[in-house]
């Protein structure tokens, strides 16, 4: 923000797909997120999305890195207080309407949306100490599901992933 880049930031922790969505919804030039994704906490990474909301290609990443390497981070990169950025308007919180639009789009993508299904089916959900709790449970509830159990030990975000060292739901041990 101190370098003249307009910043839109979620006011609370949000999962990766919301950054991709907000990038498109707000018509921004790019989206950036620091995330552990489905990796162990020591592998937190930097994800960059293009204006289309897709992760940038290897070629685009190389171009960005080449520009970064031209900078003297001590002389060329300005910093400022976060609140000063908010006050100046260079940092803006993403409004709740974007989150609501994201949830609605997720619901619209459901293959069973609007169909007659048993809404009391037992659903067990684990955010794996990530950031999916609020959007997943909100979406399920708005779709009418009522029997949702959240795994308490993995409910809150924790980048150390204390109960699941490799939080990838595709890995069988993560779901044990």
Please report, for each region that a protein language model flagged, where it lies by residue.
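N-terminal small/polar loop signature for handling phosphorylated ligands or for N-terminal nucleophile
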Residues: 1-43, 139-176
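Gly/Ser/Thr-enriched, mixed-charge loops and adjacent short helices
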Residues: 44-174
């Amino acid at each position: 923000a101190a370098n003249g880049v307009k910043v839109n930031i979620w006011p609370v922790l949000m999962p990766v797909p919301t950054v991709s969505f907000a990038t498109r919804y707000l018509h921004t030039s790019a989206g950036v997120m620091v995330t552990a994704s489905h990796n162990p906490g020591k592998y937190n990474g930097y994800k960059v999305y293009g204006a289309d909301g897709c992760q940038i290609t290897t070629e685009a990443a190389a171009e960005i890195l080449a520009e970064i390497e031209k900078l003297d981070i001590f002389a060329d990169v300005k910093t400022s207080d976060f609140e000063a950025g908010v006050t100046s308007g260079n940092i803006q919180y993403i409004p709740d309407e974007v989150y609501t639009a994201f949830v609605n789009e997720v619901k619209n993508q459901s293959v069973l949306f609007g169909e007659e299904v048993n809404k009391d089916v037992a659903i067990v959900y684990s955010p794996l100490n990530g950031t999916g709790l609020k959007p997943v449970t909100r979406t399920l509830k708005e779709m009418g599901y009522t029997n949702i159990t959240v795994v308490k030990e993995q409910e809150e975000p924790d980048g150390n992933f204390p109960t699941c060292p490799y939080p990838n739901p595709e890995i069988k041990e993560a779901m044990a």
